[in-house]
Amino acid sequence: MIRRLLGVALLTGAITGCTTIQLEPLPEGMTNQPPADWAERSDHLSRFDQWQLRGKLAVKQPSDSGTAIINGWRQQGERYDLSLSSSFLGMGTTRLTGVPGFIELTLANGETYQSSDPETLVAAATGWNLPIDNLAWWVRGLPAPEGDFRLLFDEQHQLAILRQDGWEIRYDRWQPFIDSLPALPARITALNGDKRVRVVISEWQQED
């Protein structure tokens, strides 16, 4: 009898607990159900880890805003080599090289800085708050392997929004840059509170 009453109490508690969950409504025209080919598509993109892209970067935040040309962003697995040119804050050509958890930043005047905290170093040198370690994943249309995430898909079965680590990444446009791969992002807007980072990609290349 006691066991039966305990079971009823637990079941009642579980039902009561479930009724308190607040589900965030989905944006109109979007679903959190991945399309049938998502597993195959994301597998292709995750194995696409030797690449180079070119384009433009724009940052808007309360303290300032600015734009930069992405002369080249080369990714070899976890290792990145990113060259930016901008007149903002007299940056000139700035080079970022590193792996997750380590960065070397070289300014136009040749000064070089290293840090185990990439985001803090980039913010100190340029004034820009960029999610450096996650960008190589987000720019391909994939969540970073560390941290919870949420994916939302549009009516064309493309990834439309990725939410992770306090950022909302909106995939504004996809294009078939490389014949052997699914469509790749051509325009991305990343939002975090009052910060906005926009990347417009003009060229993707696959490297051996």
Swiss-Prot record:
InterPro entries: LolA/LolB/LppX, OM_lipoprot_LolB. One of its GO terms (biological process) is lipoprotein localization to outer membrane. Pfam families: LolB. Residues 1-17 form the signal peptide. A lipid is attached at C18 (S-diacylglycerol cysteine). Keywords: Cell outer membrane, Chaperone, Lipoprotein, Membrane, Palmitate, Protein transport, Signal, Transport. It is found in: Cell outer membrane. GO terms for cellular component: cell outer membrane. It is a lipid-anchor. PROSITE patterns: PROKAR_LIPOPROTEIN (PS51257). A lipid is attached at C18 (N-palmitoyl cysteine). Belongs to the LolB family. Monomer. Plays a critical role in the incorporation of lipoproteins in the outer membrane after they are released by the LolA protein. NCBIfam families: lolB. This is Outer-membrane lipoprotein LolB.
